[in-house]
Structure formats: structure tokens, C-alpha cells
Amino acid sequence: MIKQPLAACILALAFAGVHSAALAATPKETVAAFHEALTNGDKDRALAFLSPTVAIYEAGYVERSRDEYAQHHLGGDMEFARTTTRKLLKQNERIDGDTAIVWEETETTGTSRGKPVHAFGTDTMVLEKKGDGWAIVHVHWSSRKA
């Protein structure tokens, strides 16, 4: 019967779509998709771009895994991203084999928890090649008031 192989093919394509949606083709695309997921409040998609052992540095604090980030700052980061506008001022990328670094300069404006926001930021992300895509293994966020 044709129905069974067709159903299996559709199911396989659906799973392949989930994988390709989670890992973007280039380091820059991965970083952009991660920020887009934060802005859209898509927790599962944002976490899919992070290695399970990601290290996130922000304001002197360290989160040592994807699970720790999910339990602590992810919700606040999504809320902040939804209520502010992040403008990319400059972005660079360096790829060396299965490792890449993306560093950015940003300007963020808007409101967060009822207070005005205007800040300049510097972001550095280290990524590792995973199959056809990239996973974020380290994030360092830093910002200052404008």
C-alpha cells in the first residue's frame, strides 16, 4: 500500500524540518535566529540554538547550561526583547573549522517594565558546527546606558 510509505515520508520530512529550523546554516544566521526567537517569545526555538553546555555571561553572572538559562534568565530576556527594539550597528564573523565567533555592536531602545531603555551593547557568541548547522556554546552580553 502506498499510504504507509507516504505517511512515513511525511513524518520524516516533518522531523527534518524541526532539525533544520533549530540549526541555521551560518553562524550569523544562527545568532539572528536566536535573537528572533527571543523577540517572538519562542522559548523552545531559542533553546534549540543553544548547546546543552552553553555558558552565558551577563552583568557579572554566569549560567553554565541551557537548562540553567531556561530556569533563570530566559523568561526575562524574552520579555525584554519583546518590549524593546534591538538595532544591529555592526557585526563580524570569523569561522575556523568547526568553531565560529560572532561579535556585534547594538543599540536597544524601548521600554522595559515601564521604564525607558536606551542602551548600547556588545555581544560575543562562540558557536560550534553541528551537522549542517551551528549551535551557540558561549554568550557574553555587555551593555551600557546611552
Please describe what each predicted stretch is.
Residues 35-42, 50-54, 58, 73, ...:
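Sec/Tat-exported extracytoplasmic proteins
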Residues 2, 9-13, 17-53, 67:
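Short, low-complexity N-terminal intrinsically disordered segments enriched in polar/charged residues
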Residues 120-146:
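Short beta-strand edge/turn micro-motifs at domain boundaries
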Residues 29-30, 85-87, 122:
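Short, conserved clusters of charged catalytic residues that mark active-site
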Residues 55, 71-115:
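Surface-exposed, charged secondary-structure patches
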Residues 50, 60, 104-108, 123, ...:
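A mature extracytoplasmic/lumenal domain signature
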Residues 62-63, 116-120:
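Short, mixed charged/polar active-site loops
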Residues 57, 109-111, 128, 142:
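A generic structural motif
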